[in-house]
């Protein structure tokens, strides 16, 4: 997933409408890239993107659960290499964020045989099942151990035997999943004889105990292995188990396992792994080769930063090898911008394929047959996103794909008379011949088309974006650049109310996030909507604004993004306050006497900061699931951006909103779910105690047993939306004056 996109989505429900509009589920391309498969009406079908012809590959009548006497409902599926068998994942349950546990079934298309995997194992306990490359076995995880099941005989081999809740084989603990995107924790060897896997030793990690008080007469303790900032992380190591002998060889990776992270690992040869290692502060990244025969390791490439090193990709699987494994493609910010590099296998030679003062967003496809790399970027407007291509062997001939016109690197221009400014998304076939293209802008609802590459021409002109795009004339959004008092230029948007009259004054609702995990200023349809408001916020006469502060993950240089290092709660809050102050000066129709700020998660923290520290700027704040004290959050995230509290504890204290709670002057509504495994409910209790200490009156809502998204249970969203709307309307009255 894109560097830029994932950080937008990490605001999760705060941009739910935008996410749904912009993102189709991941396309399941066939191996040759000339078609794709999907689930439709319970059947697994194959679709030809050129003719749009649909062919049923697996009929729902063939996948009947004999015990329930009804068809399986595939959550996901995977074919073997020759498309004669398919793994079906169903009856799933959530593990923290995602439904990664459930039942797996194997359907043999030629034999017309359906088999449930994991006989004798607990129902709904299998995770990450996948075919071995030779197609003879299926590997999966159950109850923290790794298994291999022979397809022909059905024999199940338990490859690890020491797995417990605290000693995890083949998957990850809470922190690795949340902060590194690591879930699937094992990889088949190319010959199918071995499995490389992560083992996470969380035995020394203290549990955070959540309390379920709603599901029975007696409360139930829910332990979460959660290493808080300043605490050592889980000890992680990589092993290789022989499927036939069950012998395990552990990789001898230098550095203490609790002072380094191993977030990426893949096979790089028959008896070799490639691994990415980050040190505890995440300021040093090393790429290693591990010999799976003797466990020895060799470092072949490294980079460092005085702030932090981002992971190469948000998707933890795969490695971009080219030239028969002699080189690989890598993304790095080592020159101050996010660029694409070609690196030799031994790490001794590197070629920077993209150059100049701009960031690339994400690699969309490596079409090695045509020496092309397709990637997204936006050199001239950080609120937008476009597709580019480059020739791997001739990177100076960098062309932008835009409305079928190739524009050379020397002709980069932010203005296209016949183009469509906004946010473009692409899913490109493995062979580089087809692309599923989505587009929207602030005033263009989402549209989609299928393209033929490299020509960049629609497969169906009648269904092309040019034929179907329309302008929403009801939208009144203005993108502005704000130059603050300390000469920092910030991007912002203003969403004006319906029937706007510039001679009148309107209340202002400031939506904030502010931390390195997400940005909010996007030229995309729906990104300006307030999903939590019950009713039509524009019809009710509110102006809505948002600002991307320094430190937000936008395409404006590594220096921009990393200026927040050790300064969360400082740089970002200052930028927001100064930017908002400047907006009030620039736009006289904004009513300074009716200003409200709100946000969720990191945005909740920013809301508290602004309300506590700038009491004359904001009259009202609504903070949801905020980190009140940075020392309460997990170590991977907080240490990446703030360092170690053992070395600079004052930065954590000064950056925590609870430090300033005594300054509350305006109206505060604070909301939190008691079952929040991410930002723990103890943040709410700490904040409440501090406000009580100083006799600060406020409104408070705790949602019993709800998680960070406050979405579980009947009526929850309706109640939350009503609460939010009523409070806003009461303390920041709507309408023009």
Question: Over which residues does each language-model region extend?
Answer:
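Residue-level detector of secondary-structure boundary/capping sites
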Residues: 5, 137, 183-187, 229, ...
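Alpha-helical hydrophobic/aromatic positions enriched in membrane-embedded helices and signal peptides
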Residues: 9, 124, 181, 223-224, ...
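Bacterial Sec-dependent N-terminal signal peptides
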Residues: 1-25
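A periodicity- and composition-biased signal for non-globular, repetitive helical segments
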Residues: 11-13, 155, 556, 640
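Beta-propeller folds
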Residues: 21-421, 430-434, 444, 474, ...
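Serine-hydrolase catalytic core recognition
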Residues: 206-207, 264, 409, 416, ...
């Amino acid at each position: 997933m894109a560097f830029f996109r994932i950080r937008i989505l990490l605001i999760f429900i705060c941009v739910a409408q935008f996410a749904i509009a912009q993102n189709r589920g991941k396309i399941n391309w066939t191996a040759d890239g000339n078609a794709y498969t999907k689930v439709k009406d319970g059947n697994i079908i194959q679709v030809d993107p050129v003719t749009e012809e649909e062919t049923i590959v697996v009929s729902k009548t063939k996948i009947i659960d004999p015990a329930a006497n009804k068809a399986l409902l595939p959550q996901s599926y995977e074919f073997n290499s020759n498309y004669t068998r398919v793994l079906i994942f169903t009856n799933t349950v959530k593990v923290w964020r995602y439904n990664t546990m459930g039942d797996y079934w194997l359907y043999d298309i030629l034999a017309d045989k359906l088999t449930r995997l994991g006989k004798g194992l607990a129902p709904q306990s299998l995770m990450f099942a996948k075919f071995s490359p030779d197609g003879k076995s299926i590997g999966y995880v159950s109850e923290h151990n790794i298994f291999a099941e022979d397809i022909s005989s059905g024999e199940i081999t338990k490859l690890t035997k020491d797995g417990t809740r605290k000693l995890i084989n083949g998957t990850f603990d809470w922190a690795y999943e949340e902060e590194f995107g690591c879930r699937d924790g094992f990889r088949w060897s190319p010959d199918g004889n071995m499995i490389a896997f992560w083992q996470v030793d969380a035995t020394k990690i203290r549990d955070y105990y959540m309390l379920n008080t709603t599901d029975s007469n007696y409360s139930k303790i829910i332990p979460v292995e959660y290493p808080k900032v300043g605490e050592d992380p889980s000890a992680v190591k990589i092993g290789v188990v022989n499927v036939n002998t069950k012998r395990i060889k552990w990789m001898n990776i230098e550095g203490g396992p609790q002072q380094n992270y191993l977030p990426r690992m893949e096979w790089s040869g028959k008896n070799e792994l490639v691994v990415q290692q980050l040190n505890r502060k995440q300021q040093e990244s090393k790429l290693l080769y591990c010999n799976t025969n003797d466990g020895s390791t060799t470092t072949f490439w490294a980079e460092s930063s005085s702030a932090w090193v981002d992971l190469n990709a948000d998707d933890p699987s795969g490695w971009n090898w080219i030239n028969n494994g002699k080189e690989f493609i890598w993304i790095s910010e080592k020159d101050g911008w996010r660029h694409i590099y070609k690196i030799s296998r031994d790490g001794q030679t590197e070629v920077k394929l993209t150059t100049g003062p701009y960031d690339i967003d994400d690699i969309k496809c490596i079409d090695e047959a045509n020496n092309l790399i397709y990637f997204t970027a936006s050199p001239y407007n950080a609120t937008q996103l476009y597709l580019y291509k480059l020739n791997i062997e001739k990177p100076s001939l960098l062309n932008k794909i835009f409305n079928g016109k190739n524009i050379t690197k020397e002709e980069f221009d932010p203005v296209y008379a016949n183009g469509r400014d906004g946010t473009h998304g692409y899913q490109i076939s493995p062979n580089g011949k087809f692309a599923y293209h989505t587009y929207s802008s602030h005033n263009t609802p989402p549209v989609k088309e299928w393209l033929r590459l490299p020509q960049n021409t629609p497969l169906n002109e009648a269904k092309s974006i040019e034929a179907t795009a329309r302008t929403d004339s009801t939208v009144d959004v203005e993108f502005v650049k704000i130059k603050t008092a300390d000469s920092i230029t910030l991007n912002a948007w203003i969403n004006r109310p319906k029937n706007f009259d510039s001679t009148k004054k309107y209340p202002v609702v400031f939506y904030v996030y502010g931390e390195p995990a997400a940005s909010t200023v996007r030229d995309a349809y729906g990104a300006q909507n307030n999903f939590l408001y019950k009713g039509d916020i524009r019809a009710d006469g509110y102006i809505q604004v948002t600002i991307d502060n320094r430190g937000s993950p936008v395409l404006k240089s590594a220096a921009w993004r990393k200026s927040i290092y050790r300064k969360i709660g400082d740089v970002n809050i200052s930028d927001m306050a100064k930017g908002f102050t400047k907006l009030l000066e620039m736009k006289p129709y904004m009513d300074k006497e009716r200003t409200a700020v709100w946000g969720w998660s990191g945005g909740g923290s920013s809301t508290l900061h602004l309300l506590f520290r700038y009491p004359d700027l904001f009259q009202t704040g609504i903070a949801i699931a905020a980190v009140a004290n940075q020392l309460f959050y997990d170590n991977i995230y907080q240490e990446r951006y703030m360092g170690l509290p053992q070395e600079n504890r004052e930065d954590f204290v000064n950056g925590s909103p609870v430090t300033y709670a005594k300054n509350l002057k305006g109206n505060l509504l604070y909301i939190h779910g008691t079952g929040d495994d991410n930002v723990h409910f103890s943040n709410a209790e700490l904040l409440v105690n501090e406000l009580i200490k100083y006799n600060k009156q406020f409104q408070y809502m705790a949602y019993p047993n709800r998680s960070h998204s406050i979405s579980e249970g009947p009526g929850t969203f309706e109640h939350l939306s009503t609460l939010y709307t009523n409070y806003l309307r009461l303390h920041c009255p709507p309408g023009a004056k």
